[in-house]
Amino acid sequence: MIDKIQILDNNIIELAKTFHTEQNTKIAKFLTEFGGKKGVIAFTIITMIIILIYYMKKSKEKKLHKEEDVSMFKARITGYAVALSVPITLGIAVVTKTVIKMLVNRPRPNAFPEIMVETGKSFPSGHSIGIATMVTILIYFVIISDMNRVLKYILVTLLILFSIVIASTRLYMGVHYLSDVIAGLTLGYIIGT
């Protein structure tokens, strides 16, 4: 089974090479940053702000409806707690990724050094875990929001596609195998929930 996965992984890297152009490489290098440390930190901050705004709005709605001050206070405290859970969830993703990388100890392919060379271990993809975790948290807030259903479906679909595109850049650049990326996305979606 492992041999078949490795054969598929190698074939996907060869397939990725057929898409290499100067323009595609520029795009991939730009997009991959969304799954890197700076990108995930930015996503974390944006997500925390969205959460705080959402719960502050809920708190104001309670005030407009002349509900008890306790109810408004609960909405605000919930907002702060949920916002703080975002970096905690991301921390869990980072620890999980680090432990699995140490246990599996899979070398990176670094198949296209002219495009990018990464250090560290390959399995699972940290970019994939990071972006999938953040996207899953955002999806949750899209789902519970007051948006109409069609807009929710569109946003959820776009967020999932975005995470897949970011993960795919790691294949394009030859710094991860397909199985690394699939494992990273799967772990990120699970941890994000």
Show where each model-derived region lies.
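Small-residue packing motifs within transmembrane alpha-helices
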Residues: L31, G79-A81, S85, T89, ...
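Transmembrane helix-loop junctions and nearby membrane-interface residues
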Residues: Y55, S59, M102, A167, ...
